[in-house]
Amino acid sequence: METTTITSILDDNNNNNNNNNNNNNNNNNNNNNNNNNNNNNNNNNYNYKEWDNEMVCKWLHDTKRIQKVSIEIFKANEITGNYLESLTDKMLLKMGLTIRDLLSFRSEFDDLKNIFNETNLYNNIQKNSIDYSIDNNNLNNLNNNNNNNNNNNNNNNNNNNNNNNNNNKTIKAPTIDISQYVFIKQMKGSVNCSLEKYINKKTKERILIKRIGKSNINEETIINEISILCSIDHPNIIKTYGYYKDENYYYVASKFYPKGSIKTKSKSTPYNEINAKKVFGKVLKAIDYLHSLDPPIIHRDINSDNILFDENDEPILIDFGLSYKELKDDNNNDDDNYDNHNHNHNHNHNHNHDNDNDNDTNVKIKTQCMEPRWPSPEIHREPPHFSKESDIFSFGCTLFEILGYIITTPIIILPSIPSGMSLECQILFNETTKIDSCFRPTSKQLLNFSWFKETALLTSSEPQPLEPQPQPKPQTSQSKPKPSSSLSSSELPPQPPLESQSKPKPSQSKTQPTQPQSKLNPSSPPSSSSSSLSEPPKPQPSQSKPKPSSSLSSEPPPLEPQPKPQTSQSKPKPSSSLSSSEPPPLEPQPTQSSKPQPSQSKPQPIQSQPTQPQPTQPKSSKQQPQSKQQQQQQQQQQQQQQQQQQQQQQQQKSKPEQSKSKPEQSQSKPQPGQPLQSPSKPQPIPSTTKTTTTTTTTTTPNNNNNNNNNNNNNNNNNNNNIITSINLIECFKKNNSKIIISKDMEFDNPYEKTLHEKHLLKLGISDCKQININHKYFKKVLSFLNSHLTSALQMKMGPYQVDIAPEFDNIFKTLFISLVLEKIDKDTLLKGGKDLGDTSSTLILYTFYYFLSNTLIYQIILHKPTSFKLVGKLK
């Protein structure tokens, strides 16, 4: 009995164990069926050592962190899975990976190795557990419980996923009753996607409604857009009221802002840094709010048209979302001044950049709409990469635009920072417009910049003193005496009467007998000249005052004991500079400097009694300057005629003849004896010796000024003629503004020649051609390329020294000329250098293409050369 019972119990236990094992196997099979993807990844996908090149490229693409350019480099070098561990940083940089892709590759590969090691450990543990499960019933029971729990968890996860998918289609945004609104007009758009204006029947409130066709875009993306737009709550972001849908369209309602954009406001009232700081500080807070959401929202097209003002003059950031990308500007006229919304631009936000569906929709919609006004360099990659850093780039360009330093044209070149900008603003612009997005600050970091703080108000007002600089009155009084003293000290005598006028004006403001006399003087300038000739004693006292001034100008010590003449001399000096064109009266006066020395005692008692002699002196003093004004006009006309004659004579004369004229100039100064006869004689007799002396003296300063201007222009031209490491400019100079392209160019090896011939054939250039290029246009583009090409190559190649290959020079020549001739369009330009040669030259060629596309040089070259303008400060 005992044996039977024991055997029966053992048999029962064995049967139970077999049943449990069968159940476990069934459960495992079910789990395997439910999780085929995970098991395949654990068994096959994560075994990277057995991957071929195609699997490696697929893995890099699935990471969504590595650019397509780097994936093509892995594909071109035929890197398989067993080589992944042996790739060092130096090798990756030489291959052409950027620093960002290198870091992304390292992090992704570390995760891959960890998963691979974990799967191996799991498989080993599972094998060991199977071995021990034959003898251990407890382990079987535990496995059964674990498998049951896993099944329940899988079922729960599936149910949750189904519930989430169903919930995603429900919009949380409030609905609006479209019947309560009356259609006014369609502002922008087409039949399938448009921007319309409505007004409420009761409240008369105007709203904007975006009408989006369901057939144009995926319904789930529209639902996500509307739900997230309605959830945004920020005082500086456009308010979305709700939505309405019918069988064919979605209607999204938002607030209407009639005050217009900051672009139109800046045209009427230009912004300085203090005012711009208040506006853009709030705009930056709105951007930071969008970037801090989970998932973050990326605006994608921040510009001056998308910053509006509400009724309280608060800035409002508008127009973002995938559903608005297809809006096109069909109606250019807008009666209600709302054309500044510009919803036709490409303003989008990316809720989750890690999803394939989102990226696909972004790329598709990107091809159907206009490009952003201020696109960052990474947007022009294939595929375009939008990120938070692209918003920072657009923000910096918009700020620079509102301050008046960028011309708002489709051609974009980042200019050199002007000197009038404050240091804090220069730092902000430099940081926000970095070529590599990795080095741009975040929105939170920008808010901590010194330019946005109150302490920067003093420094931000530094560029404003550029406007009040033109102050002619105070500056001329001080700046003009310097040239007068440098030219000759004899210019002072004819101007002291102005001193007597200038003195009584501040001292005796009530007595103004001079004003009626000034009206009479214009009618009697010749009489004054005749009276001055007939009455020698009168001009002597008038000239006696300046003569000590002339002696004072030559002798500084007597200036100290006479404070009054010093003040009087400071005022006539500007007039002397004005009368610098009058050489004849200036030269004869030093000859009389010996005579009026006793007359110096006369003006002193006159100064002691200013009440009596002053009314008599200003009469003669006013007559003289007025007569001088006419004389100046006459002399200027004579000088112009004489200059023309001299120019003709100089062309005919030889150099020794010009040397003879120099001693005549040296002798002309002591010859003139009468100061007042010289201006009267040159009128009827332009060919006398005295006139020749005057012409030589008058033309020399003008010639010097012309020479100085010419020298300055030459210096500016020399600054533009920058010789670079590229031999293109030298070739350009040797061929007299022409570049010769031929198939017989010299090459170091046959590979370069074949590569060059392939490129020429691709461009359609089979014979030798001589092509004319605008010199200024060519020089500006090359100077810009030279300043940024090295940095772009270093960014692409890594922190190593970049040596431009000789084939790069030749291909650069043909490429530039082909772009000017419009032999290459934008699409072929962005393909890269992979079609022009082998992998050894692909890197350097692609770098050049990449640089051109990122800096938007192709937009300049593909346009007409006349449309090319250097960016500068708006006037």
Curated annotation (Swiss-Prot):
It catalyses: L-seryl-[protein] + ATP = O-phospho-L-seryl-[protein] + ADP + H(+); L-threonyl-[protein] + ATP = O-phospho-L-threonyl-[protein] + ADP + H(+). It is a single-pass membrane protein. Its EC number is 2.7.11.1. Keywords: ATP-binding, Coiled coil, Kinase, Membrane, Nucleotide-binding, Serine/threonine-protein kinase, Transferase, Transmembrane, Transmembrane helix. CDD domains: PKc. ATP binds at residues 187-195, 210. Residues 654-663 have a biased composition (Basic and acidic residues). Residues 555-564 have a biased composition (Pro residues). Residues 1-47, 136-170, 331-362, 461-718 are annotated as: Disordered. Belongs to the protein kinase superfamily. Ser/Thr protein kinase family. This is Probable serine/threonine-protein kinase samkC. It comes from Dictyostelium discoideum (Social amoeba).
